[in-house]
C-alpha cells in the first residue's frame, strides 16, 4: 500500500523549480553547446549538431534583447516583422531552444540523482554498457525464444502541441518556463518541421534536434510510466477500475479512492492482463510487446492500448498501427536486423539396453539476419553500387588522395561489419564487402585513368588489408595458421557494447 501511495504522490522536491531565470545566463549556452566540456557528460542526449555560428558576442546580444523585451510575442500573420527575433530569427530561435532544452533537463537529472542516492549501502548497477544498441539483443535472445506472440506497435506522435506542454507541466512547475515552451512550439507549429514521417519509423528534423528529442522522450515517458503502473497493478483491479486512471489530469486526485479500492479484498479478481512473461522494448518510434500468452490475450492488450492513447492523449489512434504476429512465423525489422524466432530441429538417438529410439526435438532459437535488400538500397543511394548491387565508382571522391579514398571505403566496411557482427549468417556481409572493395578499386582506377585490372595488379594485396574487419584482424593475429574449423568462429554472433548509433553510409559525402 505504501508503494502505491509513493508512486501516485508527486515528488514534492520538484514542486518549485524556477528555471526561467537560467535562460538569461551565459554559461547555460556554453553548457548547451558543450564548450570546454566532455561531450559524453551530457545528461540525457548528446548534442548531435554543433553550430559554429555560436559566439559569446551573439549570446550577449540575445540576452540583452530578452532583457529589453517585456514579453515573448509572435505574430502568426506577419512573423517576419517580429521585432524581437529580427533578421537573425532562425539563429536566435535555435540558440534559445538549445539552451531551453538544457535547462528543462535539470528536473530530470535531479530526479535521477535522488533515485541513485536511495541506493546507499547497496551496489549501484553500472548502466554504461546498456547505452549500446547491441545490449538489447542479448536480452531478446534470452527471453523472446520462449514467447509466442508479439505486438508490433507504431507509437503515435502528439498531433497537438499543447499535449507536449501538459506532459512537461508535471515536472516543471515554473509557469514562465512553460509559456516560453509554448512560444517555441508555436514558432515551429507545423509538425512537418518537427517530425519527418516518410517511413514507418519516423525521425526528427535536424534543426533543433536535441530540443525536440527531449520533448518526444518526455512524451513517451509519460505514456510508459502510466502504462507500466497500470500493468503492474492490473491484477488487483476490476475490469472497469483502470479506465478512470487514464486521465492524467486527475491522476493524483484519485489517491484516496485508490487506497480504498486496493484495501478491499475482491472476491472476484480480473486476471485478463496477468502475464508474468510480458516483455516490452521500445526503439526508433516503435515498440514491441511480447508475451507467452494466447492470441486472445494479445488482442485484449491491443484494444487496451488503443483506448489508452485515445483517452489519455486525445489521439485518433486506430488499430491498424498495432499488429499481432506470431514469433515463429514472422520476421521483423528491428534496429537494422531481420529478427525472428525459428524452430531448430535436431535428432537425438537414445539407447536403452537393446532398444534404440530416435527423438525429434525442435528448439526455438532467436535468429538475426542482415537485411540485404535495404542495405544494398542504402549503398545505391550513397552511389556505391546500382540498385541491383553492381559496384560503381564514386566520382565525388576522385579528387582525394589514394590513402583517403581507401580509408573512407575501409571505414565504412569496418563499421558495417562491426554493427552487423551479431548476424547469424555472415555471407551477406561478405557480399557487401565485395561491393565496397570493388567500388573502391573503380574509384581509384577512375582517378588514375586506368582499368580496374591494371590497378589491382599494381596495388597487390595492400587494398585487401584495408578492408579487414576488426574481428578478422583479431582472428588473424590469434590464429596465424587458420584452418577450416575457424569458419565456425566467423559464423558466431558477437555483440558489442560500444555502439551508440547507426552510422550513416553517406556520412562522408
Swiss-Prot record:
Chief place of localization: plastid
Keyword Chloroplast: yes
Domain of life of the native organism: Eukaryota
Single GO biological process annotation from the record: mRNA processing
InterPro entries: Domain_X, Maturase_MatK, Maturase_MatK_N
A Pfam family the protein falls into: Intron_maturas2
Keywords: Chloroplast, mRNA processing, Plastid, RNA-binding, tRNA processing
KW Chloroplast (keyword) present: yes
Single GO molecular function: RNA binding
GO-annotated cellular components: chloroplast
Protein's cellular compartments: Plastid, Chloroplast
Role of this protein: Usually encoded in the trnK tRNA gene intron. Probably assists in splicing its own and other chloroplast group II introns.
Family: Belongs to the intron maturase 2 family. MatK subfamily.
Protein name (record): Maturase K
Organism: Nicotiana plumbaginifolia
Taxonomic lineage of the native organism: Eukaryota, Viridiplantae, Streptophyta, Embryophyta, Tracheophyta
Amino acid at each position: 500500500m505504501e508503494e502505491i501511495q509513493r508512486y501516485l504522490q508527486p515528488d514534492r522536491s520538484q514542486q518549485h523549480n524556477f528555471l526561467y531565470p537560467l535562460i538569461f545566463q551565459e554559461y547555460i549556452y556554453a553548457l548547451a553547446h558543450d564548450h570546454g566540456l566532455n561531450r559524453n557528460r551530457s545528461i540525457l542526449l548528446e548534442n548531435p549538431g554543433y553550430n559554429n555560428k555560436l559566439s559569446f558576442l551573439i549570446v550577449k546580444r540575445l540576452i540583452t534583447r530578452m532583457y529589453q523585451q517585456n514579453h515573448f510575442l509572435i505574430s502568426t500573420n506577419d512573423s517576419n516583422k517580429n521585432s524581437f527575433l529580427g533578421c537573425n530569427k532562425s539563429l536566435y530561435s535555435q540558440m534559445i531552444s538549445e539552451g531551453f532544452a538544457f535547462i528543462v533537463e535539470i528536473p530530470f537529472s535531479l530526479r535521477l540523482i535522488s533515485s541513485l542516492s536511495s541506493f546507499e549501502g547497496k551496489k549501484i548497477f553500472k548502466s554504461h554498457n546498456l547505452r549500446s544498441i547491441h545490449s538489447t539483443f542479448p536480452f531478446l535472445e534470452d527471453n523472446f525464444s520462449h514467447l509466442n506472440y508479439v505486438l508490433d506497435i507504431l507509437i503515435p506522435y502528439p498531433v497537438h502541441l499543447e499535449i507536449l506542454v501538459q506532459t512537461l507541466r508535471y515536472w516543471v512547475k515554473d509557469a514562465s518556463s512553460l509559456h516560453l515552451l509554448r512560444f517555441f512550439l508555436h514558432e515551429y507549429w507545423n509538425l512537418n518541421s518537427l517530425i519527418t514521417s516518410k517511413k514507418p519509423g519516423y525521425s526528427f528534423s535536424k534543426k533543433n534536434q536535441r530540443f525536440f528529442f527531449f520533448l518526444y522522450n518526455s512524451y513517451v515517458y509519460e505514456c510508459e510510466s502510466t502504462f507500466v503502473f497500470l500493468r503492474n497493478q492490473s491484477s488487483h483491479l476490476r475490469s472497469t477500475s483502470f479506465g478512470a486512471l487514464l486521465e492524467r489530469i486527475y491522476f493524483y486526485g484519485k489517491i484516496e479512492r485508490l487506497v480504498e479500492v486496493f484495501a478491499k479484498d475482491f472476491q472476484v479478481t480480473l486476471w485478463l492482463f496477468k502475464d508474468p512473461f510480458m516483455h516490452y522494448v521500445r526503439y526508433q518510434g516503435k515498440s514491441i510487446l511480447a508475451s507467452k500468452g494466447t492470441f486472445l490475450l494479445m488482442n485484449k492488450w491491443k484494444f487496451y492500448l488503443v483506448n489508452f492513447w485515445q483517452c489519455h492523449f486525445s489521439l485518433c489512434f486506430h488499430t491498424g498501427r498495432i499488429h499481432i504476429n506470431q514469433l515463429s512465423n514472422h520476421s521483423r525489422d528491428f534496429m537494422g536486423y531481420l529478427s525472428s524466432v525459428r524452430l531448430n530441429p535436431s535428432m537425438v538417438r537414445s539407447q536403452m539396453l537393446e532398444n534404440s529410439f530416435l527423438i525429434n526435438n525442435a528448439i526455438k532459437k532467436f535468429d538475426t539476419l542482415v537485411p540485404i535488400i535495404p542495405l544494398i538500397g542504402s549503398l545505391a543511394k550513397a552511389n556505391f553500387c546500382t540498385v541491383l548491387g553492381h559496384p560503381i565508382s564514386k566520382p565525388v571522391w576522385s579528387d582525394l588522395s589514394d590513402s583517403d579514398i581507401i580509408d573512407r571505403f575501409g571505414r565504412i566496411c569496418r563499421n558495417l561489419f562491426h554493427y552487423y557482427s551479431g548476424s547469424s549468417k555472415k555471407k551477406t556481409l561478405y557480399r557487401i564487402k565485395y561491393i565496397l572493395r570493388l567500388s573502391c578499386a573503380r574509384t581509384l582506377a577512375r582517378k588514375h585513368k586506368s582499368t580496374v585490372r591494371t590497378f589491382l595488379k599494381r596495388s597487390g594485396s595492400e587494398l585487401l588489408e584495408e578492408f579487414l574487419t576488426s574481428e578478422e584482424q583479431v582472428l588473424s593475429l590469434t590464429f596465424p595458421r587458420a584452418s577450416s574449423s575457424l569458419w565456425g568462429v566467423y559464423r558466431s554472433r558477437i555483440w558489442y557494447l560500444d555502439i551508440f548509433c547507426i552510422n550513416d553510409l553517406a556520412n562522408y559525402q
